[in-house]
Amino acid sequence: MSNVLVVAGHEFSRLARSPLVIFVVVIICLSTVINAAGCSVLLHKIDDVAAEPFMSGIGNLFYFSSIFFSFLALCMGIMVVSGDRSVGALRVLVTKPLHGRDIIAGKLLGMNALLLALVTLFVALGAASLAVSYGMPHDSGETALKLIIFGAGLFLFCALVTVLTTFLGVVFRELVSVLAISVSFLVIAWFARLQYVYAAVGKFELVNPVVQYVRLSAPVAGCDIFNPYADQFIFSAWFAAALPFAMLVVAEIGMLFAASCLLFKDEEK
């Protein structure tokens, strides 16, 4: 376990100092400020008809933040295995007294710890800037719960993307191949959310990780955490409807992580 934490700490600090993450923090700050400025006018227009306009303002950031963070997670996942392999850094780690599973687990732990910090920063800044520009939510407790659900769902989706790209980095040795497959998969996953694609594939759309992620926020009609016109948010109803999707995402993360560790262990031999 100590070896995993050492690798995780190194990966966290290495990625945190990268220009990519600095760029991300700048984009996070700009997007929350721009959204708050727009919502300061927009949300007051629906005050009379909306039960809780505050979450509608957060919902404006949903697709932007989801696509943005998923591509950030993809870049990180490619960097930590395929990128390191392309410059020979993995060969240095393998010569150390480390098991293959320690390297993969440590890299994923450090990477996802940084993503968790960035997601938390994004949600906190988004809520704080909205509270300053528009005002406090009508029900602070319910809004806080919805913000936690949004942040947790976004982090789970990012974790799934990182473990998927790590798995691809272990399977395919060429950086270009991993980059092409990962980007293509993510673009297709988001593109498949279009209505005419759903009409063609029907229930098979549920295998799409983007669909699984979106269903965490709105698992069934009436349980959308961003719906400003809902009179009451019933947590038990949301939990019962969203739990299968959350378990599916966690199971996918676990299976891809286990497969990555096993395959990388074979490479070590």
List each model region and its residues.
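Aromatic- and glycine-rich beta-strand/loop motifs that create alpha-glucan
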Residues: 1-28
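Helix-capping/transition residues at the boundaries of transmembrane alpha-helices
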Residues: 14, 82, 93-95, 165, ...
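Residue-level recognition of transmembrane alpha-helices
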Residues: 25-28, 107-108, 182-183, 249
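Secretory targeting signals
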Residues: 28-77, 105-173, 235-240
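Terminal transmembrane helical anchor/hairpin motif
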Residues: 38-56, 179, 184-263
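Hydrophobic/aromatic residues in alpha-helical transmembrane segments
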Residues: 73-77, 90, 125, 164, ...
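Transmembrane helix boundary and interhelical loop/hinge segments in multi-pass membrane proteins
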Residues: 74-94, 100, 108
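Short cytosolic juxtamembrane segments of multi-pass membrane proteins
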Residues: 265-269
